[in-house]
């Protein structure tokens, strides 16, 4: 079943390549089949927000990826919630 989720990632997650890491990993998941769309961005409070839409299994894989993060990151916690599906989302991108 298709879902759309917002993930807020807290800890040392800015200035460590977190957004590029997420984009790279989503692109790898999407190589086999187009499974995820959405975006990733830094927030002013030092956290990172990921909006992702796709099948539940792909979202679960993404959550595990977010828990690990890139080598220089230190993920302290992740908040997630389901939000309304946006049928206009086609790609996954980094927002500045």
From Swiss-Prot:
Superkingdom of this protein's organism: Bacteria
InterPro entries for this protein: Acylphosphatase, Acylphosphatase-like_dom, Acylphosphatase-like_dom_sf, Acylphosphatase_CS
Broad EC category: hydrolase
Residue ranges occupied by any Acylphosphatase-like domain in the UniProt entry: 4-96
Record's keyword annotation contains Hydrolase: yes
Keywords for this protein: Hydrolase
PANTHER family: ACYLPHOSPHATASE (PTHR47268:SF4)
Name this polypeptide is given: Acylphosphatase
Organism the protein comes from: Helicobacter hepaticus (strain ATCC 51449 / 3B1)
Source lineage: Bacteria, Pseudomonadati, Campylobacterota, Epsilonproteobacteria, Campylobacterales
Gene from which the chain derives: acyP
């Amino acid at each position: 079943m298709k879902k759309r989720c917002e993930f807020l990632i807290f800890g040392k997650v800015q200035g460590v390549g977190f957004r590029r890491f997420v984009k790279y990993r989503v692109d790898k998941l999407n190589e086999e089949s187009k499974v995820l769309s959405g975006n990733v961005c830094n927030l002013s409070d030092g956290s990172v927000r990921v909006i992702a839409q796709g099948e539940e299994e792909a979202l679960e894989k993404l959550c595990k990826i977010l828990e690990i993060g890139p080598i220089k990151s230190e993920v302290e916690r992740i908040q997630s919630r389901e939000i309304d599906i946006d049928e206009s989302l086609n790609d996954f991108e980094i927002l500045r």
